[in-house]
Amino acid sequence: MAAPVLRVSTPRWERIARVLVCLLGILLSLYAFHVEREHARDPSYKALCDVSSSISCSKVFGSRWGRGFGLLGSIFGNDSALNQPNSVYGIVFYAFQLLLGMTVSAMAALILMTTSIMSVVGSLYLGYILYFVLKDLCVICVTTYALNFILFVLNYKRLVYLNEAWKQKLQAKQD
């Protein structure tokens, strides 16, 4: 016997928060991509996020860790198609979170949660590199780390909410 189809929806505040967080993430990632491209084209380029020598996003984006998380170039080679600027991965991640967040399937909720966990782990890794290795503060980077954590919380709340809603709907169908 097939599993019953249970129609539920997520709270409106969650959908609005997801759209805002994902759009902000996409915009910041596009700006990071722009800064990296301009800095590569003109090394004297000064981005809006370059406040001082220790608060500089273009210094971070231009570093080894600004592409492929500092790992993919070592594994696949610097010319590999996978060794893209981190901002490209950010654009894909936030677009994916936005689009998949429009569905309420159990599989989508699990994928959203799994990718959020991966983004938080990646943020912790890059935050460590930022602070302890590069000894820099990148406002764009830190903001995206915060957005990743907010998405993690949203996805966790979504999973809990949908689980509870499905339980209630299933209970009502059985009664």
Curated annotation (Swiss-Prot):
- Chain sites annotated for binding (S)-warfarin: N86, Y145
Q: Which gene encodes it?
A: vkorc1l1
Name of the protein in its database record: Vitamin K epoxide reductase complex subunit 1-like protein 1
Q: What is its EC number?
A: 1.17.4.4
Any idea which UniProt keywords this protein has?
A: Disulfide bond, Endoplasmic reticulum, Membrane, Oxidoreductase, Quinone, Redox-active center, Transmembrane, Transmembrane helix
Q: Which InterPro entries match?
A: VKOR, VKOR_sf, VKORC1/VKORC1L1
Among its keywords, does the record have Transport?
no
Per the UniProt record, the lineage of the source organism begins with: Eukaryota, Metazoa, Chordata, Craniata, Vertebrata
The similarity annotation says:
Belongs to the VKOR family.
Q: Which domain of life is it from?
A: Eukaryota
Q: Where in the cell is it found?
A: Endoplasmic reticulum membrane
Ranges of the Lumenal topological domain: 36-86, 135-137
**UniProt topological domain (Cytoplasmic) ranges:** 1-12, 102-106, 160-175
The disulfide bridges present are C49-C57, C138-C141
